[in-house]
Amino acid sequence: MIKRETQVDQILKDIRGIVNQMVPREAKITEIEFEGPELVIYVKNPEAIMKDGELIKDLAKVLKKRISIRPDPDVLLPPEEAEKLIFEIVPKEAEITNIAFDPSVGEVLIEAKKPGLVIGKNGETLRLITQKVKWAPKVVRTPPLQSQTIYSIRQILQSESKDRRKFLRQVGRNIYRKPEYKSRWIRITGLGGFREVGRSALLVQTDESYVLVDFGVNVAALNDPYKAFPHFDAPEFQYVLKEGLLDAIIITHAHLDHSGMLPYLFRYNLFDGPIYTTPPTRDLMVLLQKDFIEIQQSNGQDPLYRPRDIKEVIKHTITLDYGEVRDISPDIRLTLHNAGHILGSAIVHLHIGNGLHNIAITGDFKFIPTRLLEPANAKFPRLETLVMESTYGGANDIQMPREEAEKRLIEVIHQTLKRGGKVLIPAMAVGRAQEVMMVLEDYARIGAIDAPIYLDGMIWEATAIHTAYPEYLSRRLREQIFKEGYNPFLSEIFHPVANSKERQDIIDSNEPAIIIASSGMLVGGPSVEYFKQLAPDPRNSIIFVSYQAEGTLGRQVQSGVREIPMVGEEGRTEVIKVNMEVHTIDGFSGHADRRELMNYVAKVRPRPERVITVHGEPQKCLDLATSIHRKFGLSTRAPNNLDTIRLR
């Protein structure tokens, strides 16, 4: 370790020599240090660098590093003074709603209803803010819905700024350590989510680095730890955790089967490194993780982890936008690309060993446009191995066309409301809920739906997070929000359910209603309570719009089971008779169906040498792998959990 520190110090010494030659003296450099995947140059006079628009680019080109210029902490105005000055500089018409300081990066976030007025003509107002307060301003439009999750994350990052900076410096020194070995081999090991859906975890190993992609929990199998959690018993994984060798964890998206076990690692001090993901994924996975342990507690179970462990996840997360390239170890470079599955979902591209090998790991993805998101990216700089999901990889897994699915949804709703019934749509709080909301809002606007739409569980909070990241939404939605001035998420037809009393009032009411409630597979959350009480009435309908995993209550109901034993409030088992109509409309899935999966392999560029199918029931993974090999002549594999494949 001492040797590694000495090596990094020498690298920094060499860098300082180059920077001092290229940066004008009036910038007054005070410190140069690696922080996370960036080289940070602290200066007392940032304007001296900013006035030369090409200097940072030239530095990055020479040093082959991502460069960030930050004001020296000593020149930053105290937050109270800086905030007062910002309000004096920015016109009142900008309607600033929030100012948040992040001392760990010397940045001030300014939320305003009219961000253009904060920026000013040709950026004049922004430059004046920088000049006067020294903090680096970041301007965003005020989200129309306030998210408690986003607020609490900002508070944590601000209060933990000193620890955060220390952590980032440790990460930076680890990334830019001198490699002990030249990259010669690459392997991947399935720790979860191979020939199954749930607990996704993939370990990438080189002779220099260890990187984990996803670390999820199978919420449908919590009573069986061997099926619920990734394989901690894998010898190589035990070794990596014990020796503290894991360089990074990358999270493709927020759903618990991909992110749900992250806090567990911090609870038991198994990991202290960086987590890379997109900003929306960070916020959404924190929301889902908190809800997960709250549901466990309400069910009388010991939660897998504590709120303080989720706080550690926040402190250790480094966010990247789509297309940003970052070094995450001496021989691995990461880029995240749109996956089209849920807000912020990403395809992980790993460039290994300076051209030795390139891997794209799709996570969950969708390859057609939806109301909510653009289709998954299929173009990469280089690509040799493609690891892709197979949720709907079976030969007959053809989803209903989206237009037909929407018409069918409205048809079932009309029939149910006409007979005085209620419609229950169990939906994942993140993704399917917002997709269905957009469909219902569109039809309600033209008068095709005339009933209240209730949103229960975390759906409203998740929707608030969606409104905070409009740049991640579909082009059509962005046009509606910014050009047409209409935000469909704010429609009057949506009514968030605040508590259990309101929930019971909706159930007891004689009025027809549409209810969208989490969870999507009926494995906890308010959707289960609605189901219990609405199922016996034949006037009601339940509509499944997303995948129902094996072993879930949702799969039982979907499969036609008409009598289901369930535990009541007093702990007694009661048999629920399912007299309500049961419908499945698969055209709303956030997963690519068989045609999309095959089309993705046909369209992805460059064409990979090898395709590995994961995240699907065994036969679907095998079927997809076989079909890809036959049609495209590519090498394919459908490995099991614990299988290791050498890629190079």
Swiss-Prot record:
Activation/inhibition comment: EndoRNase activity is inhibited by 1,10-phenanthroline.
UniProt keyword terms in alphabetical order: DNA-binding, Endonuclease, Exonuclease, Hydrolase, Metal-binding, Nuclease, RNA-binding, Transcription, Transcription regulation, Transcription termination, Zinc
Record's signal peptide: none
Cofactor binding, per record: Binds 2 Zn(2+) ions, which are required for nuclease activity.
Keyword DNA-binding attributed: yes
GO terms (BP aspect): DNA-templated transcription termination
Segments for region (Metallo-beta-lactamase N-terminus): 185-395
A GO term for molecular function: RNA exonuclease activity
Chain positions covered by the region annotation Beta-Casp: 396-589
Region named KHb: 77-144
Region of interest (KHa), ranges: 9-76
Chain segments carrying region Not required for dimerization, required for cleavage at some sites: 1-179
Transmembrane found in the keyword field: no
UniProt-annotated binding residues for Zn(2+) 2: D257, H258, D364, H615
Biological role stated in the UniProt entry: Terminates transcription on the whole genome. Termination is linked to FttA-mediated RNA cleavage and does not require NTP hydrolysis. Cleaves endonucleolytically at the RNA exit channel of RNA polymerase (RNAP); the 5'-3' exonuclease activity of this protein degrades the nascent RNA released from RNAP.
Domains as described in the record: The 2 KH-domain containing N-terminus is not required for dimerization; its removal leads to loss of cleavage at some sites and destabilizes protein-RNA complexes. The extreme C-terminus is required for dimerization.
Complex formation: Homodimer. Interacts with RNA polymerase (RNAP), interacts with the Spt4-Spt5 complex.
PANTHER family listed in its UniProt record: CLEAVAGE AND POLYADENYLATION SPECIFICITY FACTOR, CLEAVAGE AND POLYADENYLATION SPECIFICITY FACTOR FAMILY MEMBER
Designated name of the protein: Transcription termination factor FttA
Organism encoding this protein: Pyrococcus abyssi (strain GE5 / Orsay)
